[in-house]
Amino acid sequence: MAAVSLSVSTVKPLGDRVFVKISESEEKTAGGILLPDTAKEKPQVGEVVQVGPGKSNDDGSRQAPEVGIGDKVLYSKYAGTDIKLGSDEYVLLSEKDILAVVG
């Protein structure tokens, strides 16, 4: 089996899926206490880096995605599939798991 080299540019989401770079989680509490990895909350915010062509409708047409590359999004806490590429973490989500576009 041949090895596959993955990078952000080689990941092409299918259908209504969206590839999101996860924002860094907080390293400290508001009071300045350092958090161990096991105590950190799973981030729910990230930046869209790839977007699929959209959801297929019953008539064969595509519904264009509501988000685009560069949008900062808020998504469901346990949604999607986590993927690590190099030192960066990503999540592959269905568009329905995105709750809002933020700031």
From Swiss-Prot:
The keyword Chaperone applies. Keywords: Chaperone, Cytoplasm. InterPro entries: Chaperonin_GroES, Chaperonin_GroES_sf, Chaprnonin_Cpn10_CS, GroES-like_sf. The keyword DNA-binding does not apply. PROSITE patterns: CHAPERONINS_CPN10 (PS00681). GO terms for biological process: chaperone cofactor-dependent protein refolding. Its main location: cytoplasm. GO terms for cellular component: cytoplasm. Pfam families: Cpn10 (PF00166). Heptamer of 7 subunits arranged in a ring. Interacts with the chaperonin GroEL. This is Co-chaperonin GroES. It comes from Synechococcus sp. (strain CC9311).
